[in-house]
Regions:
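N-terminal, positively charged/glycine-rich alpha-helical extensions of SAM-dependent methyltransferases
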Residues: 1-14
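Class I SAM-dependent methyltransferase SAM/SAH-binding core
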Residues: 41-43, 49-96
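Short catalytic micro-motifs in class I SAM-dependent methyltransferases
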Residues: 110
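Conserved catalytic/acceptor-binding region of the Class I
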Residues: 125-201
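A short acidic, Gly/Pro-enriched loop at the edge of an enzyme's catalytic core
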Residues: 96-105
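Conserved alpha-helix/loop element of class I SAM-dependent methyltransferases that forms part
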Residues: 21-40
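Conserved Class I S-adenosyl-L-methionine
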Residues: 49, 174-260
């Protein structure tokens, strides 16, 4: 199912580019401060439409980006027209032939969890020089923002999507655990270091519905249930929240240095 779901993002690349948020600028400052300043060579896995890639390129990194979806890769190419130091490859990281020259950084923003868990850490190590950094960004929806809305929206998810865990509630950032298990289990990386960033994004009704249609869980719903869910959420925002809600995010940068 994961292999199938990771392909749904390519179905509507323009919506993805329009609706998905970017990343806190401090992520890229902390990456540089960790020993990987520009013009380091970066391999970005799953760049999508280039949300993080643009920020890296603007800082002077030399980037090879690999993207599974052809439509997403084409959108990224358009977004990065002014950055000749970026090369975009269409394909899967698992099957791509690594170049002979290793990279200084392997970077993945909200994409590493889509890579085969059996090989993603070891293959990232293969792509890096000794001392190079594996930098992954995870994005979490956390407690905060328009909390009353999200509690009500949860009931709509439970009604229309049977995959929804019952009584699911948003957690504060402090309750989200660091995910270092796969790094700790590898003998090729040192201990993981974590940096966290909380931030808010405001959405109108149409903007939020657009965002929901970029999520794999929403896109994979049967069409009648998907339409009913989106209609219900749209009415909820319009009628109870004046057509605008705020969502709180936690972005987490995980850094691990290759040691062998």
């Amino acid at each position: 199912m994961t292999t199938e779901l990771r392909r749904v993002f390519d179905e509507d690349a323009e919506r993805y580019d329009r609706a998905r948020p970017g990343y806190p600028p401090q992520i890229f400052e902390d990456l540089a401060a960790a020993g990987a300043p520009p013009p380091a060579r970066v391999l970005e896995i799953g760049l999508g439409t280039g949300k993080a890639t643009v920020s890296l390129a603007e800082r002077g990194y030399r980037i090879t980006g690999i993207e599974l979806g052809a439509s997403l890769a084409a959108a990224a190419q358009r977004n990065l027209t002014d950055h000749p130091a970026v090369t975009i490859v269409t394909g899967s990281f698992e099957e791509w032939t690594l170049p002979e020259e290793p990279f200084d950084v392997v970077f993945a923003a909200t994409s590493f969890h889509w890579i085969d868990p059996a090989t993603r850490v070891s293959r990232s190590a293969d792509a890096l020089r000794i001392g190079g950094l594996l930098a992954t960004v995870a994005t979490h929806h956390i407690k905060g923002g328009t909390e009353v809305f999200f509690a009500a929206a949860q009931r709509l998810y439970e009604r229309y999507d049977p995959r929804t865990p019952p009584n699911l509630r948003l957690e504060p950032a402090r309750d989200i655990p660091h995910d270092d298990a796969e790094i700790a289990a590898s003998d090729r990386f040192g201990p993981a270091d974590f940096h966290r960033y909380e931030w808010d994004a405001a959405y109108t009704t149409s903007e939020y519905l657009d965002l929901l249609l970029t999520y794999s869980t929403t896109r994979s719903m049967p069409r009648p249930e998907q339409s009913a869910l989106l209609d219900g959420i749209g009415r909820l925002i319009d009628e109870e929240h004046g057509g605008r809600i705020v969502k709180r995010y936690l972005s987490e940068l995980r850094l691990a240095r290759r040691i062998r």
